[in-house]
Amino acid sequence: MKFTIIALCLALSLVGMTSSEKLLDRIRANSLENLSRLVPSLCLLPSGRGNCDSQILRYFYNATSHTCEVFLYSGCNGNGNNFDSLECCLKTCRLNKYRNNN
């Protein structure tokens, strides 16, 4: 009798884990879909220097030339078209450009 109850509990917990994993997968898929909607708008923004006094080398995606370009970020404000590295800028905006053109 104890074995049957333990087996039943184990089976129910496994079913619960599978359902939880499916829910997490669904949440991840929705997050990626929402991100892919957000990325194009970020990449279409002009470079946003901001209004502080620092001069930090950053990259923005120039939607006209379809390239990532260097700009000096002031350290505050600005906008989302602001990447720490050329690689990050290219991966975010160029990949999305090709996805939208197909």
Swiss-Prot record:
SUPFAM superfamilies named in the record: BPTI-like (SSF57362)
Classification via CDD domains: Kunitz_ELP-like
Chief location of this protein within or outside the cell: secreted
Gene Ontology CC: extracellular space
InterPro entries attached to this UniProt entry: Kunitz_BPTI, Kunitz_BPTI_sf, Prtase_inh_Kunz-CS, TFPI/VKTCI-like
Post-translational modification: N-glycosylated.
Entry protein name: Early lactation protein
The organism's taxonomic lineage, starting at the top: Eukaryota, Metazoa, Chordata, Craniata, Vertebrata
